[in-house]
């Protein structure tokens, strides 16, 4: 991979939180926003941003609790709050319509935003952003609210008592990242780690994200409501899935039928992080979609 020339950093305020984003320049081009997934950060999009910056004004936020953005007071993180932050950022940028590309949690945020403001989004790419597959949701639905709330309380207390993992070096943290995603190259893992860790007072390194972003809240995921929201999306939508991923196939499980204008790309030899695992394939598919 060629050397990446970095973007500039900026900040904005949402719900009294100071949130960070990077800007890849080319302000006269159409706006395109890349939204990362959970426990990730803005610089995980660097390879994609660098490929798109020639034709687009690429902006990439760190979601609250991630990267160089502030952590939420109380460690409370929900999709509506992330959507609020993206709405605030886009209003600060003040350029519509916008193209959104999101991965996982970021894909869910992009889908929710577009359902609320369909006239503001020109095109949408969601990499495994539809949430848990229906079979997984069915298993969760069997638990009553008090059991889900009890599990949430125990999880919150567990995270409160747990010290975040520390690594003696960046190389050690990068090795952990490779364990998490064996599709990554050593170069990719190191780049993601360099931008994903902060140095602690004792000289060790820790991930920048707030551990509380891992907490699963007890509210049920309402598939009927989600399908109604997806049906509000008016723009062309590209759904991307890795064939080696845990995420369900939205054609096989029927979720794609909720969209007005959507198609699916299943990428071979890719897991959940399709844009890392098969970068060239991802760029080719997204480039063709955006050029239509």
Where are these regions (language model features)?
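Catalytic histidine-centered segment of alpha/beta-hydrolase-like enzymes
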Residues: 267-283
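Conserved HGGG/HGGXW glycine-rich cap/lid loop of the alpha/beta-hydrolase fold
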Residues: 22-71, 75, 255
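Conserved alpha/beta-hydrolase catalytic His-Asp/Glu region
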Residues: 161-220
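Alpha/beta-hydrolase fold catalytic core
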Residues: 1-32, 53-56, 94-97, 131, ...
């Amino acid at each position: 991979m060629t050397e990446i020339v970095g973007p500039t950093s900026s900040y904005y305020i949402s719900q009294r939180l100071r949130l960070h984003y990077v800007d890849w320049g080319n302000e006269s081009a159409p706006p395109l926003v890349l939204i990362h997934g959970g426990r990730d950060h803005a610089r995980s999009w660097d390879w994609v941003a660098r490929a798109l910056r020639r034709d687009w004004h690429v902006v990439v936020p760190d979601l609250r609790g991630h990267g160089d953005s502030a952590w939420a007071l109380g460690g409370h993180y929900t999709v509506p709050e992330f959507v609020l932050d993206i709405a605030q950022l886009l209003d600060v940028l003040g350029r519509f319509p916008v193209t959104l590309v999101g991965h996982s949690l970021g894909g869910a945020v992009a889908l929710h935003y577009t359902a609320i403001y369909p006239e503001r989004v020109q095109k949408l790419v969601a990499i495994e952003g539809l949430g848990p597959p229906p079979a997984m949701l069915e298993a969760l639905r069997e638990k009553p609210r008090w059991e889900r709330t009890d599990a949430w309380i125990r999880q919150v207390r567990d995270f409160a008592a747990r010290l975040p993992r520390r690594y003696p070096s960046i190389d050690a943290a990068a090795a952990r990242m490779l364990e998490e995603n064996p599709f990554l190259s050593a170069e990719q893992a190191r780049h993601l780690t360099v931008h994903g860790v902060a140095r602690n007072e004792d000289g060790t390194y820790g991930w920048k994200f707030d551990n509380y972003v891992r907490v699963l809240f007890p509210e049920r995921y309402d598939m009927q409501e989600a399908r109604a929201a997806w049906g509000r999306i008016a723009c062309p939508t590209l759904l991307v899935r890795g064939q080696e991923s845990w995420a369900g196939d939205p054609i096989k499980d029927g979720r794609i039928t909720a969209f007005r204008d959507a198609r699916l790309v299943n990428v071979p030899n890719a897991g959940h992080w399709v844009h890392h695992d098969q970068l060239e394939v991802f760029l080719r598919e997204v480039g063709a979609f955006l050029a239509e």
